[in-house]
Every structure is written in structure tokens, then in C-alpha cells.
Design a protein with these regions (language model features):
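General beta-strand recognition
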Residues: 47, 57, 104-105, 134
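A mature extracytoplasmic/lumenal domain signature
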Residues: 52, 62-63, 95, 108-112, ...
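Bacterial N-terminal signal peptides
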Residues: 4-15
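A short gly/proline-enriched turn/hairpin at secondary-structure junctions
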Residues: 57-67, 80-85
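Surface-exposed, charged secondary-structure patches
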Residues: 71-119
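Short beta-strand edge/turn micro-motifs at domain boundaries
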Residues: 119-146
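Short, low-complexity N-terminal intrinsically disordered segments enriched in polar/charged residues
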Residues: 13-54, 70, 145-147
């Protein structure tokens, strides 16, 4: 029981400390998300993967796991080349949860102006490396069905 109290005290203390000053981190994460949106709309796979950690990975709906920047860059370039040149992509943050001062889970919603998929949602793990927030893992799911 004593160990549980210590663990809870440490967790509560960490949560209290990390809750302070999150505004700047949330703004940086939202700016990172805007950079992803911008790179995708430019069809710039290199710029997209630069927003991931070197060993980052992604799984898009029912597709394979893509790990590492080189793999994601080549596969992403092929995916982006298949997009209609007039299609626009928007990405919005729907939730941010900080696990530590340098790790956050970010929920997003995406919209597409044309094509067979008009919306999806994603969950990513962002880590702060050298002062920059980067995606360590991204999972993309179909959009939530209307109730």
C-alpha cells in the first residue's frame, strides 16, 4: 500500500508540474500539424517525413507499416503522386494529451476536398527532440461514423 501511495504522489506531482506551461507546447504541436498539412498540400513527401523522427513509423488504415524516413519518403511520394492535383487536404487537432513533458498523444481529423475518402482521423505520438516536436508513430483510421 505504501508503494502505491508513493507512485500516486509521484504521478500527481508530475501531472501538476507538466500541466503548467503547456500552452507553448500545445501551440508548437498545432504548428507542427499545420506544417504536415502544408507539406501534404504541396505533395512534398520529403517535407512530410522531415516532421517524423528518424525511426518513426506510420500505418494508414489497412495499409502496411512504413518505418523510417527513407521508406516513408518513397511510399509517400507514390501516394501523393496519385492524389488529384486539385484536391486539398485539411488537418485539425482534436485533442492533445501529454504523457510527459516531451511526449504527447495527438488526435487529428482530416478532410479531403475530393476523392473516394473525404475524411479520416489519426492518432500520433509526438516526441520533443532537440526542442522540436516530431512524430514517432502515426496511425490513421476511417472517420468516426455519425451517431
Amino acid at each position: 500500500m505504501r508503494g502505491s501511495v508513493v507512485v500516486l504522489a509521484v504521478m500527481w506531482g508530475t501531472t501538476t508540474v507538466s500541466a503548467q506551461g503547456r500552452g507553448a507546447d500545445e501551440a508548437a504541436i498545432r504548428a507542427h500539424t499545420a506544417a504536415v498539412e502544408n507539406a501534404l498540400n504541396k505533395r512534398d513527401a520529403a517535407a512530410v517525413v522531415a516532421l517524423f523522427t528518424a525511426d518513426g513509423d506510420e500505418i494508414d488504415t489497412d495499409g502496411p507499416r512504413r518505418s523510417g524516413r527513407d521508406t516513408m519518403r518513397s511510399a509517400g511520394a507514390a501516394d501523393l503522386a496519385a492524389w488529384s492535383p486539385t484536391m486539398r487536404f485539411s488537418l485539425s487537432v482534436t485533442g492533445i494529451r501529454f504523457l510527459t513533458a516531451d511526449i504527447a498523444i495527438v488526435e487529428t481529423a482530416a478532410r479531403f476536398t475530393e476523392g473516394p475518402v473525404r475524411a479520416n482521423r489519426g492518432t500520433s505520438v509526438l516526441v520533443r527532440q532537440d526542442g522540436n516536436w516530431l512524430i514517432a508513430a502515426l496511425r490513421v483510421y476511417p472517420a468516426q461514423r455519425a451517431p
